[in-house]
Amino acid sequence: MILKSFIPGNLISLYMTIINSVVMVGLYYGFLTTLSIGPSYIFLLRARFMEEGEEGTEKRVSATTGFIAGQLMMFISIYYVPLHLALGKPHTITVLALPYLLFHFFWNNHKDFFDHRRPTRNSMRNLSIQCVFLNNLIIQLFNHFILPSSMLARLVNIYMFRCNNNMLFVTSSFVGWLIGHILLMKWVGLVLVWIQQNNLIRSNVLIRSNKYLVSEFRNSMARIFSILLFITCVYYLGRIPSPILTKKLKGISEPEEVGESEEERNIEIETISEGGGANQKQGTEENTSSSLFSEEEVDPSKETEKLRVTGKKKKKIKGEFHFRFKETYYKNRPVYETSYLDGNQESSKLEILKKKEDKYLLWIEKPLVTLLFDSKRWNRPLRYIKNDRVENAIKNEMSQYFFYTCQSDGKEKISFTYPPSLATFGEMIQKKIYFFTPEKWFSDELYTDWSFINELKRRNLSKEFIKRVESLDKESFDLGILEKRTRFSNNETKREYLPKLYDPFLHGPYRGRIKKWGSPLSINQTYKKKNTDPSWINKIHALLLTTDYHDLEQTLDTLNIKSLATEKELSLLTLTEDEQGDSEDRVKILKFLFNIVITNPNNQTIRKKSIGIKEISKKVPRWSYKLIDDLEQQEGENEENVTAEHEIRSRKSKRVVIFTNNQANADTYTNTKDAIDPDQTDEVALIRYSQQSDFRRDIIKGSMRAQRRKTITWELFQANVHSPLCLDRVDKPLFFSFDISGPLKRISRNWICKNKESKISDYTEKKIEKKDEAKREKYKREEKMRIEIAEAWDSLLLAQVIRGSVLITQSILRKYIILPSLIIVKNIARMLLFQFPEWSEDLTDWNREMHVKCTYNGVQLSETEFPKNWLTDGIQIKILFPFCLKPWHRFKLQPSHKDPMKKKKGQKNDFCFLTVWGMETELPFGSPRKRRSFFEPIFKELKKKIKKWKTKCFIALTILKEKTKLFRKASKETKKWITQSILFLKGIIKELSKINPIPFFGLREPYELGETKKDSIISNKMIHKSSLQIQSMSWTNYSLTEKKIKDLTKRTNTIKNQIQKILIIKDKKNEFLTQEINSSSNKISYQDKILESSKKFWQIVKRRNIRLIRKFYFFINFFIEKIYMDILLYIINIPRTNTQLFLESTKKMIENFIHNNEANQERINKTTKNTTHFISTIKTSLSSLSNISIRNKNEKAFCDLSSLSQAYVFYKLSQTQVISFYKFKPILQYHGTSLFLKNEIKDYFEERGVSHSRLRHHYGLRQKIVWHSGMNEWKNWLRSRYQYDLVQNRWLKLGPGQWRNGVNQHYLAQNKHLPKWDSDEKERLIHYEKKNDFQANSLLTQEYKLNQEQKYKKSNFKKHYGYDFLSYKSINYQDKRDPYAYGSPFQVNKREESSYHYNMDKQNFFDTLRDIPIHNYLGEGDILDAMGNFSHRKFFNWRILDFCLRNKVDIESWVDTSTKSKKNIKTVVKNYQIIDKMDLFYFTIYQDQESNPSNKKGSHFDWMGLNEEILSHPIPNLELWFFPEFVLLYNAYKVKPWIIPIKLLLFNFNGNRNINKNIIENKKRDSLIAPNEKQIIGLENRNQEEKEPIGEGGLVSDAQKQGNFKSVLSNQEKDVEEDYDKSDKKKRRKKKQYKSNTEAELDFFLKRYLRFQLRWDDSLNQRIINNIKVYCLLLRLINPNEIVISSIQRGEMNLDILMIQKDLTLRELMKKGILIIDPVRLSVKNDGQFILYQTISILLVHKNKHQINQRYQEKNYIDKNHFYEFIARHQKMTENKDKNHYDLFVPENILSPNHRRELRIRISFNSRDKNGMHRNAVFLNNVKNCGQVLTKNKHLDSDKKKLIKLKFFLWPNYRLEDLACMNRYWFNTNNGSRFSMIRIRMYPRLKIR
């Protein structure tokens, strides 16, 4: 066994056990708290550093002892509440701590305090040692409250909740802290010893030079610690609210409660139970016998839990139990007189102070305490949370509930469902009645009893359910089969029920928010008879009253109809006779307990006769102040209401007055009403906000700003204040930033320049974008720099005064000293240079310069007027037309072809701002701009003249050079002639020399010379010739290449000539010598041949070289260009060829499409100049399509796929596994308005198995389909619930559960075309051909014989119809009468068809464009009423039709309600005359030429805003579109069809005043419904109109309709005018008189319907500000023409804004783009209901389930006689001729929803075997019976049976629904939030077989 303990696994488990033990964890956290070194260590370290000797040792010991004792008290105070409260009181800390620390500081500064060191015999009597002990003790106690406790110290408090044995954890943590403290002190001692013994310190030169330095430092240590202590005190004094200096806020009176007078003021009993620490929460499982009780007068602003005890005087006692945390420490500061409850005694003494005693006990204390510590004052920087529903700010206090143990599933578990006051009071009562309890139940017994009770209830419910199913199997349709709805009855005999809203047993539309019973237990019947009102039982009764569930359950007979009917509540409210005796004892206990609470010496008869408890209500904790900010104060002043001064500090801003209108002087603006006060001035001001961080952030005056969080600034000027935790998220750190973008840009720029030729155009665009981005970054940097400079001037003290004075000085110097001096100097210089002076021109420019005084942000005022408070707020000086000194003035006309951008750039210099240094800048605080230099034009002129002189000199030099060339040429010719003459003379001399042979050798040299000259002359001629050829053929003589070629040619010729000379000389020598020597002639001839051949060879080489050199450069260029062209052509041809292929394929597809849709092409509307409306055109096509489909029954007839959803097509394509996307590649890649070839898509779906129809089987297409059966069955089941897909605002219009009753009535009674979709006939019968493979069959047929293949086809066909229902709904969109594109064997007669078409269109105008069936549920009675349902809507839909109508409007007067029958009825909408004239709503479109002008039907309201001009949308090929209207409808497809355009929101209420003249209203067709009529009026009207023929009731005359529509508009205006008065009376105390209708319209619009943001356009905002700046200047000028023209040229003034009229309507403002409407989310009242029904809508049992069971609002009113009549009526509505028991389709529906959920929940609770058999035992054992019920009903299809067997009895189907409704059943609470997940216990996962 010993060896086994050393196994690694056992060692690890042992190690983990030791580590996770309470002792080790306590030691660890206690050791960590040692590291939380705070200011409490100051005294301890000072004793270590300063004290020496025997007394120093004693002081060190006393300091350590006091420090440890203080820390021990802190640990004890965590669990000892009185000590914690005493240490944590704000009074104690503020009054005692700071004076003590300040006193200690001044005491320590006494000179002889630390100097006297007399030894004493009893050291503990020494005052200094005692003070050291007390200092360390007290400062340690203050550490957690007045000084900051670090996070490490709080870990002990945080971890306390995780330990079961609290005291053991505290002890171990203290021991750990002690160990850590000892180690820390030892380490400090070692450091001191090391410092004293270190040789380096001793040998230091400074210390050796001053040997008394160490002793002086030791003596001054006391002062150093005193200074540190003083700094700490001052710092934390700033963080504690000053009791005297804080601002006193003006409180407002609380709303008085009804029936409560001053005598009946509530007495508040408070139990303060606080934990020590910032987030310490006191658990109620601790010993509360030592809780501190205290009381004070009622504070109506605090959260109270009222235990109201009814009596004669109705005295109210409120018990309030507060848990105060560190976060809310300074909020509430009540004064308490404490008294203790002795928990060991049998009776407690609860001392309650009387008001008479309060008067003389608190008259001295209360004013002082209120002055020092006002709990209602905003001393701490708290947020003021505004709420429209609650006037005052809500206190940020503790939650209403907290974690407490409660019984759940028979076990005690922690639940977040308990108010702390109730938990504390219940625990107190438990301690008081402990001796009454004979025995205590253990947890196992509790669980066994609970499980037994749960099993018993489950068995009873199961038996009841089985019996009901068996009775169904016997076909006994007794009323007892269906469980009736239980009503809560007040009187059994008279059948008086509670109101439906407050009936806890009702659901659906009558479900209300009430507080149900907190426990199933109740008191006895005798007590119930005494009290007429039912008493609500709370958790206290669960402690006092116990009931034997065994006996209680036996009294309930689950199969007894009487117990399930109206008497059911009596069985729950009665007890058996055997228990009455026991209950008497409990009533005594009740009397004893509540007498404790109620007894008061002044009032002994509070509650003696009967004992009862009312509900525990909660009062919202609020502050007693209603604070306003600056904006609200100004709004109140504008509305002429008396407003208080604002208490909330807004962002730092300054009010800059830009215009002051003195009405005494301005006669044009004088009003007769305001003429009483002649000195009244009207100021126009702008608010200038500071650009720095908002350190105020809505802080309240008087609160301590030092306690604000997140007030750290990282930069000098930044937009927002950052938290220290977010510093790492800053883009650029301050110290470690290195911008490498500049070097990279330079490198990239150089690289671009080097490789310019190889770059393409894309890179050029990127380069431009980079340049633009660089410009933007530069602009941002400059703007940031300007903001920093402006804020620096604004933040420094007296900076604005200095800057303003300097600017004024600079302005005067510039205008009157500097510029005139420069003008004088310039003109004198011109006279000295013999130029004409320009005095007049310069003085004119100088006079034109204007120095305009501006506000700090640049708003122009005037030249003479200074801004208001300019010395403190700042000033700018703007220079208009700044003077620039020019050396001369020239009058040149600007050429017309000049670049306008350059002109604009030149005009930027028309104004500038003056800086402090006298410089000019473009923007305030910007960088100085470069001035135009005075000498720059002079230098330019000099440069021009120098350039001209250089040009002339160059021409002269060129001529001289040519002359020299001619001279050289002439000299060369002369030299040549002389040379030839000499040669001739030499020849003569040579001839003469032959006579005399003596001078032989002398005559040979001249001869040689002559031959050489001759050859040289010839060679020179050839060289000159070649050079001339090269020069003549060259294209660029002065290019570098030609120069190289010439040089090379000359060099080559020179070398060749030299070779020839040498050869010729040798030849001559040889020849001359051979004549003398007589050599052989053969050898000489051979050499001559060699020389001649070499000469020819070199000549050829020379010519070829010359030619090659001359052509090489052009050859290279041509070769490169050829390569480039080939590559470019190849690249261009690639997309061209691909485009051709694509166009050819597209052309083929379009031809096929046109060929397949020839019938559709003929029906495309041709646009003319008439007006048509899209509904009439669509319906014309629909009727023609339906006629074609009837004629072509046996042909291939498809409908136009006019509204196929792109999203759905892509979804189906993605879901299909065997599809090839190559065919749809062009469509998938096209992002615009995709021209779907919808017939091909449909065919492709059928071929690939995505959709199935008759055509698939008709053509014998049998392809294998790959499906995931399980997933697709689940998807199919979900998709079959399409009818629950309500639109959002209609869900919110409906009440909770209303769709089960009222909506379904509309659905079944009026809309017959939709039941055709949902009924078995139209869903399953799709025009079967009478063939062998697919015979005509009906679900009404009881038996059918098909072979296996036919059965497979039929089941497969039906199944895939369920899968592809959405596909058919989209593809076969236009045939509204049938979801398929084919006819049906069962066709209704024409009259019925017309009638239901008529009613469908009249009631369901929303379905004209979108085909969601649930839209047809609502009639005209269900139109959203904007007046009453704004608060119920999750989104404020400002496009709702009747957004400002008080009365509901019949949509028939607005919407086209005419339809065309197949053959007989041909009513066409044509009466659009009145609408086309009223441009308020409509736009003109083109009308169908084929429409009949004789038949007219009603006016048409453009509710979609789609009647725009077709010509405004260019369509090059209309044949590619299905209808012209759908081009316009494409954008509306993205918008929900229940909305109207934004332009209709801005309804011009005053635009149609003239319409209501001379109008004859047709009372028979009045479109206004009275407001007191019910919603069923639509149902009644519809039923009446169904009986009328279509031809009679469906058509009215033009005059009636015109008058009707005009009456609607006139009534709207009347309603609007009435709404003006109502809104003014409600929202204004003093009614404001409107000066114009526009103002009234805007005010009414903003007040009643401003649920969205009206914001300005950003660019418009800047333009308006610029205009305002110019206006302020122009209003002060006498002759503003010049300034106006220059402002317009500079772009400062925008003429578009000047065109905005004063009386523009909202519609026109919207049209101009001035106002932009943004919808805003609203707080929703019924948000929980919306989420609930959205969640469980897909989990409802079947789409036909609601058609019968929830048609009737009260099922208990159904009797047996009307049962079959009800079924027959239902069948008639669903167009089924046999009896159809839809409600019995699911056997579980027999039970009521509450019992249904209860049965499932109880089955799941008892599923001990995890395989799921036990929980479904009831259902699994009775599946056969269910099957029998289903098989006997032959009309039910097999798919439904399979669906039941597979899905209906599985637990996961209902899990979400059960969780959604769990609050109502399991917890017996109905607080309106059925998704409060903190109260729902999630069940364990159950296995699904």
Swiss-Prot record:
Predominant subcellular localization, coarse grouping: plastid
Superkingdom of origin organism: Eukaryota
GO biological process: protein transport
Keywords carried by this UniProt record: Chloroplast, Membrane, Plastid, Plastid inner membrane, Protein transport, Transmembrane, Transmembrane helix, Transport
Membrane topology: Multi-pass membrane protein
Amino acid composition bias (Polar residues), ranges on this chain: 279-293
Subcellular location(s) per record: Plastid, Chloroplast inner membrane
TM region positions: 11-31, 67-87, 88-108, 127-147, 175-195, 224-244
GO cellular component terms attached to this protein's record: chloroplast inner membrane
Ranges where the record places region Disordered: 255-303, 1610-1633
Pfam families: Ycf1
InterPro entries recorded: TIC214
Acidic residues: bias regions: 255-265
PANTHER family with a match to the protein in the record: PROTEIN TIC 214, PROTEIN TIC 214-RELATED
Binding partners and assembly: Part of the Tic complex.
Family label: Belongs to the TIC214 family.
Described purpose of this protein according to its UniProt entry: Involved in protein precursor import into chloroplasts. May be part of an intermediate translocation complex acting as a protein-conducting channel at the inner envelope.
Protein name per the record: Protein TIC 214
Taxonomy of the source species: Eukaryota, Viridiplantae, Streptophyta, Embryophyta, Tracheophyta
